[in-house]
Structure formats: structure tokens, C-alpha cells
């Protein structure tokens, strides 16, 4: 066993290439065992980067040399050889290793990651810092072909080419996303080859060659030479024009070739681009056969009861149904057709479906352009990724009052993916925008109605936020109906306290009301439905009736839903005790969604206990009523 002897990258340097190859096999076995059998997580990407990881750590000297991994989907082998082998079984578990890169987790994690296309910018900053401070170390950015579709990556490449500082960019090309880019270059070169002047020159050269002895043979050789040259040009021209020396393509599973290549590029004093070809899912045949399906893996519990449909699937199916009745509906996603539930829509309406790649800024403005021409674009993007297009939401959509629908999946606490993926800021960053309508469903059935509402709303942009995972199991009967804009839902009436809950916290709020009822406390419960516009009338009536109020949200408290309710009360001159429950001013790490909600104090038991303490503090109940909680 070689893996058990690797406590740091320095240990790799004592191994021969054949021993490194055996180590690669052991690393794959460890990833398969842990990810498939224990923790879940990103699977196929990590299997594809084992040899690349070993070669980088064999040639370079981390942590002195800076290896910056993009996104982090491919960082498990890196974690295994940088002193975290003994904790690898805790990956993505509460209190365990992160599934992504975190600077505080290891000195070998030089830059935190979770979102795509950031590695080259960060690595370039480190390379420039070395030059300014007179330090001597190598800087390497490792980026996948999927992340390379992000515009930020090209901004960084352009800047690096201009600065001409030593920087190594490694493209991990598993052919999952780069084909459209290559196709665009191919189309450009095709236009050159079909230009009249080019074709005339080609005919004249061939005519002259045929006059020579062995002329036909020379013509054949010229064609073969041009074909080879064309292939080289396709691969190298863009990187050379950006100011990089291009090397590749390299077999990403040939350790000897990788090591020799990296030893060579260590000597460069200007930007170099190393093109590495890998197989996503390498070493696990089902993942090699279907890397898309095996991009990430979830642990399956034998005998587990069936779960309700996932929010993303309810969204996707409802959109298909609505699109059948309205040919103006189009769907847009940024490289997440499966995660957003849009694969059925893509299959049913391929001409009305657009996957723009990792390009959220473009996705939003593209949707705005579609909306100017009378179409009804639905832009389905994870809440955390919509942050990347905030200026476009303001400048290109809200200012122009364009009817774009923003379907924000993974809103709230997402679980094991952790701090980079929680969608907890959207309420604050969207409710402040003029012309924006913002709503959140309490369950999967209400999601159907809110999607219908959004598509019926033509007066400007409208956003709906909904959580990751399965719904709550309510029946979904009848056609989706249009809800009144800005109208909340009164779920139960009481006179002791009013609980106003948003989205996924409505059901826990109802359960908390049941707990309070056991203590003789009668609570009004309101499903807010809308953050903007708020149902001012219902909220103010409940506040006056009860004399105190609790808000609950699975979002950041600062600037959030509770703040909107406080503003409404203040504007009405209604000064009553208010308790805001939501996410405190910190980043939440990875854990199960249930655990994270307990940490945040927004599960049913926490809502009830905190409400009891709140009522006692303000003299609404006797302190003894909460003594046993």
C-alpha cells in the first residue's frame, strides 16, 4: 500500500513512476469507496484528475509553489496527498473536510473555491505578488474545460498575456464543455478557407505543382501538410494570440509524459498554457460510460422510503406543461440543465431551450434581449450563482422593467456543499431593486402556482426562490393557478403572537405553532408568499391583534425578509416587540440541511423555544412556562 505512506507531497518525490502509477490506482479505490459508499460528493471529475494531481505535486513544491484549483470539483486527490488522508472519510460531513478548497483547512489550499472560472485570476494575482515582493515560487492554475467557458477566465488570460509574468495554466480537458468553443474557431477558419482569394490561390498552387515530376504526389502531400497545420492552428492560435506558449495536448493519464512536461514548463519565465486530455470518471466504467450522470454521487440508503418529488423536478415539469400552452416561453440555464430540472424542457422544446455555459452574466442579459421581443424567458439559475450577474439584473432587466422570470433553485441552506453554495443572500440583494417582484413557495404545490403567476406577470421582472431537495409531500392537484401579486396566506389565527414565515420555513412555523398551542399559546401563522410587495394589510392587522410578532426566513437576516417587515411596521408607526429568526451574520459550513437549520434556529423546535423566550422577555408569558425547554 502506497497511499498510507503519503502524508505530504514531499513523500511523492521518493516514488518511481511505476510506484506512482500504483498509487494512482489506490487513490481511485479510496475515492470510489468513500464517495459512493459513505459521503457522496463530486465523483467523476475527481477520478479524472488523479495522475494530473500526482504529477503536479511530484514536480512542484507545495505549499511554496502555489497550485490553484478551479471550482474544487477535482480536488479530492489533492486532499488525499496533502495530509488529509486520515480524514478523507469525513468529506462533506458536518465537522469534516470540505468538499471544496478552503484556505483554513490546509496550507496546500492556496485559494478557496466553489464557483467556477476564478483560478486564473487568483493565480495571476499570486504570480504578480511574487514579482513585486521578489519571491521565487511557481504559480499554477488548474482549470477544467467547463470552467473555461466562463468569461472571467478569458479576462484573466488576456491580462496574464499582457503582463507576461511567469504563470502556468493547465487546462484539464475532459471534452465535456469545450466542443462549442472549438466549433466556433473551426467555423472561423472555414470562412477563411472558403474565401474566394484563398481558393483561387490554392487552385493556382496545385496547378503549378502538377507540372513538376511526381506532381500528384506533391499535391497529396500538400493536402496532408495543410490538414496537420490546420489542426495545430486550431489548438494553438487562440492561446498564442493571448500571449501564452501553448504545449499539448498531453495525455492526462500518462504520468511520465505529465512529469516531463511540467519539468519543462518550470523553466519558462512567461505565461504557458498546458493542454491536458483526461477521461472524466477514469477507472470506474459506469462513470466513464456516462460521466454526466456520475458527475456527483449521492449515497443511497437501502430500504429507504420513497421521497416526494424534488423542487427542481416539479419546476421543470410545470414549465413543460405551461410551455405547451404558450409558445413564447423559453428557458435558459448556465451549464446546469439537470440540476435546475430543465432536461425535460430541453427534450420537449429544444429550439426554446438555451444552455449558455458558465456565463451567468450573459444568461441574464440574453434573457433581457429575448424579453424585449415579446418572449417570456425563464432564467433558471442557482441562487448562489445569480450573485455573479447582479449588475445585469439591475442594469439590463430591472431598469428596463423587462418581464424576465428568475427561477432561483437551491435557495436557502443547501447542505453538504457548504458556504460557497448556500443561497442565502438573494432576499436581501433582490428586494432592494425597484421593479422587482420576489416570492417564495411554502411547498412544491405552491411552486407550481408561483411559476404560473410569474409567467402571467408582464409588468416587469419577477423572481421565485425555492430550496434544494424533496418537497414536503403535499398533493399536487389541478392546473397551476395565478396568485394575486403581494397577497399573503393566513394559515391560522391566534391572539398571543403572530408568526410570519417565508418559503421553506412556513411548515416549521406551523409545527412550532402546534408546540406553542400545547403550552396554551395561540399563534397566528401567515405564509408571506411575497417578500416584495409585502402584504402590508394582513401583516399590520396581525401585528395589531397580537401585539408582538415573529418573522422566520431561511435567508440572511441583514436586509432580509424580517427587515422588510420591520420597515413596514415602522412606516405604519406601529411599535411592537419583534423577533427576527433567520441566518446570523456569518457563513455556514457544510452539514446536512436539517443540522444547518437547527444551527440557524429555524427548525420547528427552535422556532417554538425562541418564541417562548421572546414572549417571556416581553412579559407576555410567565418565565416558568419555558423552564423545561
From Swiss-Prot:
This is 1-deoxy-D-xylulose-5-phosphate synthase. Belongs to the transketolase family. DXPS subfamily. It catalyses: D-glyceraldehyde 3-phosphate + pyruvate + H(+) = 1-deoxy-D-xylulose 5-phosphate + CO2. Keywords: Isoprene biosynthesis, Magnesium, Metal-binding, Thiamine biosynthesis, Thiamine pyrophosphate, Transferase. CDD domains: TPP_DXS, TPP_PYR_DXS_TK_like. Thiamine diphosphate binds at residues 73, 114-116, 146-147, 174, 284, 360. It comes from Thermomicrobium roseum (strain ATCC 27502 / DSM 5159 / P-2). GO terms for molecular function: 1-deoxy-D-xylulose-5-phosphate synthase activity; magnesium ion binding; thiamine pyrophosphate binding.
